[in-house]
């Protein structure tokens, strides 16, 4: 997950630029200069926290986000930023507290709800994560990231029909979203609808002929259907055009074992 994108709130009076690896160091220097002149500048502490977050200096990011909340305890963006830093530090219980404060202060703050869902996923509470995502979509039904996240969790819960409905809506919004297209294919293949999954793969592969995850999904379907000849041909194509891939090697070994070619299979594990 892009942690910087999780914290969407910016101060109304001072716009923080889009931070990149190229400008983050100079931005941090600027914020430190502001703080030296006024140590109670909450926006500068907030900006400094975001800079440290990009540099993966998470403890410093937490420290300055916490200072910002103390200076301005009613700004939901600061609590979301603090929750983001705590999430990066894997302090999930603390993250839930701060993100809860952010959403209490601003119930329409969907970016904070999205991070809440990620925290619940990390602690294994998938049902709560799904509930949070559904709440997000009540506020913004076109939030693509939430739609994709929800579909992925629904698949994990074996809620195939629900996941497919969500993915259909997402693909209607973004017809070229290949991650969503692939996840819909996986939803059909996981529930055993191999024929329709292959039909979708054939449609998608015309636009994305070199998309390896799509080819791997086709390979899994071929194995599930016992179509060894097609699987062998596809494995050869994948091996000639990609870097070493553990899953491809494992599937080739299984294929060779199925063909009772034990010596060839054994070479895949040397």
List where the protein language model places each region.
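Canonical positions in the second alpha-helix
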Residues: 33-34, 67-68, 101-102, 135-136, ...
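N-terminal leader/linker segments that initiate helical-solenoid repeat arrays
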Residues: 6-66, 70
